């Protein structure tokens, strides 16, 4: 019968070997995660906030008019979505 200590040692050695093989294959593709993260978190010029003539959602509407689709809240002076109870 197989000894429990030997069985545990073989299992541990197998896991270490599996880790080494996976690490070796990943080291070849080491740049891939960096490229993926940089492409996800890259700031695109299209998504940067632009200075507009109108105020967007939840922006102050004291000096600027609200953009189309929003109305200026008389209570808070923010641009909000129009609703029947906000007339």
Swiss-Prot record:
Q: Which cysteines are joined by disulfide bonds?
A: 54-67, 61-72, 66-79
According to the UniProt entry, where is the signal peptide?
1-24
Task: Give the source species.
Answer: Cyriopagopus hainanus (Chinese bird spider)
For this entry, the protein name equals U3-theraphotoxin-Hhn1a 18
Q: Which GO terms describe its cellular component?
A: extracellular region
Note the coiled coil stretches, chain numbering.
none
Tissue specificity here reads: Expressed by the venom gland.
Location in the cell:
Secreted
Q: Which family does it belong to?
A: Belongs to the neurotoxin 10 (Hwtx-1) family. 51 (Hntx-8) subfamily. Hntx-8 sub-subfamily.
Q: Show the propeptide residue ranges.
A: 25-52
Q: Which UniProt keywords apply?
A: Disulfide bond, Ion channel impairing toxin, Knottin, Secreted, Signal, Toxin
Domains as described in the record: The presence of a 'disulfide through disulfide knot' structurally defines this protein as a knottin.
Where does the UniProt entry say this protein principally localizes?
secreted
Cited Pfam families: Toxin_12 (PF07740)
Q: Which GO terms describe its molecular function?
A: ion channel inhibitor activity; toxin activity
Q: Which SUPFAM superfamilies match?
A: omega toxin-like
Please give the function described in this protein's UniProt entry.
Ion channel inhibitor.
């Amino acid at each position: 019968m197989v000894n429990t200590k030997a069985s545990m040692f073989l299992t541990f050695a197998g896991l270490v070997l599996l880790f080494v093989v996976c690490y070796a294959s990943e080291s070849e593709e080491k740049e891939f995660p960096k490229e993926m993260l940089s492409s996800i978190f890259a700031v695109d010029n299209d998504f940067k906030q632009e200075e507009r003539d109108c105020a967007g959602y939840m922006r102050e509407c004291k000096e600027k008019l609200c953009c189309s689709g929003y109305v200026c809240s008389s209570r808070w002076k923010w641009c909000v979505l129009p609703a029947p109870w906000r007339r």
